[in-house]
From Swiss-Prot:
Enzyme Commission code: 2.7.7.12
Record protein name field: Galactose-1-phosphate uridylyltransferase
Pathway this chain belongs to: Carbohydrate metabolism; galactose metabolism
GO molecular function: UDP-glucose:hexose-1-phosphate uridylyltransferase activity; zinc ion binding
Highest classification ranks of the organism: Bacteria, Pseudomonadati, Pseudomonadota, Gammaproteobacteria, Pasteurellales
Encoding gene per record: galT
């Protein structure tokens, strides 16, 4: 006799309507022993100022240019930009196997604060508000010239961060990147088929179910999406229809700072380490269309799985077949939800 399906025990696939892909969920594998790579935990106390850091105030960058003695978030042109403003278009090819297109743009760096030691969860909500204001200013400026502006942060050496001073990046593109183009298509198709906005509908469903919500504030929710790929992946969304960061009300912007601090604090508290991740915002492009199908959201993709030293590797089947995870989204959300919103470094002894 076939056993009844149990999502915490039996392998199954979950569909991600946002990117039109499936993920294999294998919860029984979470019980397997681990004898693989153990990454060294680097938890030494960082100074608030490092004279050797290229990003600290008044220091010389690798190009020889001096940083100002900044006291709030500081933005500058990336010294090793992946995109250039004046890039000629390649010649058109008639061969369908050898196609290329023009890629113009700009790359900028945003230092979140002058303090070398403070990542987002260690900043105050007011300090994070200042970061959000700069994000919004950059979107307005760059969105006037480019159809896509990507705000993101790679936190930690495990995510390829090349400088320990807490910072993010802002890339402006003359084109829609692959992930964004896919989300644009799926959200547009959903609106045409259902007459409503996909991620607005999704927020309503998750608010009713509550089992995958990690943090909820007045205007925002952070949750482990039903279709999550990374072990403790989260999706951050406003509760109402908002297409871009620049369209947030003052109250929504302030509340975004609150939930960013709470969510990233829970991440750090999970394994009591500075939790690595890649995060970024997706929102309506600056392409002259109404983009009613779009809903602002942020993706957090952290690699850690079992501890501060054991991470998820996207290899083998994930590279050649489809994405796979062990822990269910509901189990991951339960663990994150139960964590304190007071950072482990700030707890009273």
């Amino acid at each position: 006799m076939t056993a009844l399906f149990e999502p915490t025990e039996h392998p199954h696939r979950r569909y991600n309507p946002l990117i039109d892909q499936w993920v294999l969920v294998s919860p029984h594998r979470a019980k397997r022993p681990w004898q693989g790579q153990q990454e060294k935990v680097n938890e030494e106390q960082k100074p608030s100022y490092d004279p050797t850091c290229y990003l600290c105030p008044s220091n010389k960058r690798i190009t020889g240019e001096l940083n100002p003695d900044y006291r709030k978030p500081y933005v500058f042109k990336n010294d090793f930009s992946a995109l250039l403003e004046d890039t000629p278009a390649p010649e058109k090819s008639s061969d369908p196997l050898f196609q290329s297109s023009q890629a113009r743009g700009e790359s900028r760096v945003i230092c979140f604060s002058p303090d070398h030691s403070k990542t987002l969860p260690l900043l105050t909500a007011l300090e994070i508000e200042e970061v959000i204001k700069v994000w919004q200013e950059q979107l307005r400026e760059l969105g006037a010239k480019y159809q896509w502006v990507q705000i993101f942060e790679n936190k930690g050496a495990a995510m390829g961060c090349s400088n320990p001073h807490p910072h993010g990046q802002i890339w402006a593109n003359s084109f829609l990147p692959n992930e964004v183009a896919r989300e644009d298509r799926t959200q547009r198709d959903y609106l045409l088929k259902h007459g409503s906005v996909m991620l607005v509908d999704y927020v309503k469903r998750e608010l009713a179910l509550k089992e995958r919500i990690v943090v909820e504030t007045e205007h925002w929710i952070a949750l482990v999406p039903y279709w999550a790929i990374w072990p403790f992946e989260t999706l951050l969304l406003p509760k109402t229809h908002v297409k871009r960061l620049t369209e947030l009300s003052d109250e929504q912007s302030k509340d975004l700072a609150v939930i960013l601090k709470k969510l990233t604090t829970k991440y750090d508290n999970l394994f009591e380490t500075s939790f690595p991740y890649s995060m970024g915002f997706h929102a309506a492009p600056f392409n002259g269309e109404d983009n009613e199908h779009w809903q602002l959201h942020a993706h957090f993709y952290p690699p850690l799985l079992r501890s501060a030293t054991v991470r998820k590797f996207m290899v083998g089947y994930e590279m050649l077949g489809e994405n796979q995870r062990d822990l269910t989204a509901e189990q991951a959300a339960e663990r994150l939800r139960a964590l304190s919103e007071v950072h482990y470094k700030e707890r009273t002894k």
